Structures are given as C-alpha cells and as structure tokens.
C-alpha cells in the first residue's frame, strides 16, 4: 500500500526503493548486487522488448545469441576496451573441478566475442552489412548498487553491426540513437536530449558515442541509451578484413548500441508519485482494472463488469476485473494506484441503474462518468491516449522548468543542484574533470537536435564558465545516476 512509501520530498532515494518493492517490481536477492525482477517489473520489460524488437526488425536487424563466457585473450585484444571494463569484470578461473587453461570473463558487453565470429563470417563486401541484435544478461561488478539503476547483473539488448564504409556505420549509429529517442518519447512518455558524449565520457573502445539523456524528478540526469561508432578498432583487433568492390582489402567498420532494464528505473523516477507507480499506457500490460462495488444485486454488477472487460479486450485494450471479496473497494483503489494501472473503472448498483460507470485516471487522479453505450470503448481508448500524452507533456514541462543557462561558475554551482545547466565549456578534458571533481556534475551531452540547439543557442561561441578561455559552444551539465 502507498503508506509503505516514503514521500519524495522527505527522501527521494528511499521513496524510489520503497516504491520498487511495494509495487512488486523487484526485490533484493541473496546474491550481492543482484536483484530479482518480479512479475510486475518483468511485464514492463516484456512490453519494452516487444516495442524495441519491432523497431529493430523494421530497420533490417535480426536477433542472434553469443556465449556468456569470453576468453581472456579476446578481451585483451582491444587495449582501450579492456582498460575501461577490467575493474567491473567477473572472471571464471575453474570449471569441472579443474583450473582453466585460460580464464573466461563473464560478459560485461559482447563486442569481443561477437567480432571473433564476424571475422569468420566476413570475407567480401557481399557479406556486408551485418545487422545483429542480442537480448541477453550482462555482469558488471558494481560496488554501489540500486534496484534497476545499477546492479551487478542486468538484462539488456546490444546491437552489433558491421559495415563496408565509415559513412554507412555513421548512418547506423544515428539511426539507432534516433530509434531509442522515438521509443523513449512515444512509449515511455519520456522527453530526452539526443547528442554526442565528450571524449572522456564515450564508450571504451569507441571513436564516438551518441546518447539520449533524460531528467528525473529530482533534477538528475539518467543516460537512457547509447549508440557507438567503433570505427575499425575491433576489426583491427580481430584482423577482420574484407575485399572491397574495387578488389582491395580493408578493415570492417563497426557500431554497437544498447539499452537495459535501467529504463524501468527511468520510467519510475520520471512519472511516479507518492501513491506509487505511474505507468504510460503503452508500457502497461494491464491498462484498465474494473472494480465492482458489490452491494445489493451482486450478480448483475459482476456480469456487467465482465461484459466491460470483454468489450475492452475486443478493442485491443488489456483489462481485468478484481471481484475478490477479501479486500474492500477502497483498499483495491489504493493497491492498483500503487501498481500503476493507468485507468480504474468503478461499477456499483447505482451506476448499473444509470447505465454508466466511474473512471479514474492514474496520472491526474481525476474521476469522470462514462455512459455504458456504443461509444464506451472509444472513450476509454481516448482517455488512455490522453494519459500517454499528458505524462510526456508533464515531463517535458518539468525539464524545461528545471533547465537554466548560466554565465559564471558561481551561478553554475548553485544551479546544478536543481537540474540541467546550459553553459559554455572550453572543450578540454582538464576543465571537464575539475568541474566533476568540485561539483560531481558531468557534461551529459553535446546536443545535436536542431530544436534544442535553437532553443538554447547551443552553437553560440562564448567564454568557458570555469577557465575563462574561449568556448566554441554550450553543453548540458548535470548530476547523474
């Protein structure tokens, strides 16, 4: 129930943990740093998987699966890559009661094991492009964990593509980060900023990394997806060459891209409230709950409740009845608000007599009456669409309110405690590092979307807020998860 949840204003971090556990989304396990994703949480992941998988396949990608274990020699082939991941790796040293001749790394990401296969599969330009996605689990030995947001083991998808030219790889990188943006905004109702990472923040082993960044209700940023241009780095590490259409040998160009179950954490922190989970209808496996108010003629009310569910299902709206008598209607109202069911329908004897019902929205908690006539399903569908749009609009308005532009470092230090900060940066790793050390804020993204560039005149030259040196453009700073 909602009374188990600490309020956001009292302790935002505890609110998040309380909500995840009370809404039965996930729980701690007996394995340090690992979580149990409960059915309510996994249902959200399944909806995410289905939407993303369809988007991937629409753009020509196919699914495959590669081994969980990666030989140490493979990991060592790409020096920058292993340097970035070594501290987080879990390593298998024994198997079958014996010490292994070569250590096996439990995958932190799959570039190396996949490129070992690509080397065997690619000989000619006719073998390209390869557009493969993998749904899998990965392990990164995290020291400070938080349910969904940062765990030792998590679920994700990782795309790995191979191309004949740098330009084709660049197109793929932008195509996939655009798909992630579309998914975040259209399904998660989550406005995101799309752009490039700085050199120090890019993926280990990549030439460049593109990302989408979202704002949570505490003003912090959350990286919601990344797409990496790997250049020819992994192809060279695995000697993966192909014969071009001109008959020459060249190394293959590569990309990788991924999102994970941390998107569920983003969903929770972007939309939910002190009563519990708030879900966009497109990611709710159960969009409507019908709660009969059983007084007087119970049979007629139950029959009408079942009829409502049947009608809604025929129109593609996932609905169910809770007719159990163990708990009161009031208890059920609170419980389904906690679980984030987007729409509640209340039906009692008086409603039945008036050929109507009461509907309650989870996003605004507003109640209205709907006639039980031929327009009923259409009106429910319209309300669900309205909830989806309202959640996006509300999150966008919040982000805009919590985004400020500053001209001095003193202004910056105050502003970055509350949200996103737009400021000039001189482009040096030194300045970026010192700002992070002093404020714990990082450069989240160098925006590339025209709308965002125009809104904040991002490409306007100026003076770096920290060093006072000339700055070619503005960037987005924030504290982050």
Curated annotation (Swiss-Prot):
Task: Give the EC class as a word.
Answer: ligase
- Entry's localization field: Cytoplasm
The record, for InterPro entries, names:
aa-tRNA-synt_IIb (IPR002314), aa-tRNA-synth_II (IPR006195), aa-tRNA-synth_II/BPL/LPL (IPR045864), Anticodon-bd (IPR004154), Anticodon-bd_dom_sf (IPR036621), Pro-tRNA-ligase_IIa (IPR002316), Pro-tRNA-ligase_IIa_arc-type (IPR004499), Pro-tRNA_ligase_II_C (IPR016061)
Write down the EC number: 6.1.1.15
Query: What function does this protein fulfil?
Result: Catalyzes the attachment of proline to tRNA(Pro) in a two-step reaction: proline is first activated by ATP to form Pro-AMP and then transferred to the acceptor end of tRNA(Pro).
Q: Which PANTHER family match?
A: BIFUNCTIONAL GLUTAMATE_PROLINE--TRNA LIGASE (PTHR43382:SF2), PROLYL-TRNA SYNTHETASE (PTHR43382)
Relate the assembly described in the record. Homodimer.
Q: What is this protein called?
A: Proline--tRNA ligase
Supply the source organism for this entry. Answer: Chlorobium limicola (strain DSM 245 / NBRC 103803 / 6330)
């Amino acid at each position: 129930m909602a009374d188990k949840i600490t309020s956001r204003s009292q302790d935002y971090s505890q609110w998040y943990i309380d909500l995840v556990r009370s809404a039965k989304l996930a729980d701690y396990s007996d394995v340090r740093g690992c979580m149990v994703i409960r059915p309510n949480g996994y249902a959200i992941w399944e909806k995410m998987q289905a939407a993303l998988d369809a988007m991937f396949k629409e753009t020509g990608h196919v699914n495959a699966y590669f081994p969980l274990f990666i030989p140490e020699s493979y990991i060592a082939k790409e020096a920058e890559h292993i340097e970035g991941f070594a501290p987080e790796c879990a390593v298998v040293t024994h198997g079958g009661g014996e010490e292994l001749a070569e250590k096996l790394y439990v995958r932190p990401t799959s570039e190396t094991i996949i490129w070992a296969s690509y080397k065997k599969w690619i000989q000619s330009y006719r073998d390209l492009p390869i557009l493969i996605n993998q749904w899998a689990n990965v392990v990164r030995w995290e020291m400070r964990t938080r349910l969904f947001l940062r765990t030792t083991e998590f679920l994700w998808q990782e795309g790995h593509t191979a191309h004949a030219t740098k330009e084709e790889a660049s197109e793929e990188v932008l195509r996939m980060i655009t798909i992630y943006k579309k998914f975040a905004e259209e399904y998660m109702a989550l406005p995101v900023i799309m752009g490039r990472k700085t050199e120090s923040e890019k993926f280990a082993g990549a030439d460049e990394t593109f990302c989408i960044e979202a704002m949570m209700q505490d003003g912090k940023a959350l990286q919601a997806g990344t797409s990496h241009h790997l250049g020819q780095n992994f192809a060279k590490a695995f000697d993966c060459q192909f014969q071009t259409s001109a008959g020459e040998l060249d190394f293959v160009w590569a990309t990788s891209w991924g999102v994970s179950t941390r998107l569920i954490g983003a969903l929770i922190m972007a939309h939910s409230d002190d009563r519990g989970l708030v879900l966009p209808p497109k990611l709710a496996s159960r969009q409507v709950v019908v709660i009969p108010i059983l007084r007087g003629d119970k049979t007629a009310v139950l029959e009408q409740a079942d009829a409502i569910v049947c009608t809604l299902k025929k129109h593609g709206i996932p609905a169910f009845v809770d007719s159990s008598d163990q708990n009161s209607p009031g208890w059920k109202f609170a419980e389904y608000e906690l679980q984030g069911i987007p729409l509640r329908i209340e039906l009692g004897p008086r409603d039945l007599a008036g050929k109507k019902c009461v509907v309650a929205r989870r996003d605004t908690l507003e109640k209205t009456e709907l006639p039980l006539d031929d327009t009923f399903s259409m009106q429910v569908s319209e309300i669900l669409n309205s909830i989806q749009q309202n959640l996006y609009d509300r999150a966008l308005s919040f982000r805009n309110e919590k985004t400020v532009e500053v001209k001095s470092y003193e202004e910056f230090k105050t502003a970055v405690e509350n949200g996103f900060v737009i400021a000039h940066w001189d482009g040096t790793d030194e300045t970026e590092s010192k700002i992070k050390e002093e404020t714990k804020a990082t450069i989240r993204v160098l925006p590339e979307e025209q709308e965002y560039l125009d809104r904040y005149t991002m490409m306007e030259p100026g003076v770096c807020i920290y060093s006072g040196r000339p700055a070619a453009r503005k960037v987005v700073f924030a504290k982050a998860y």
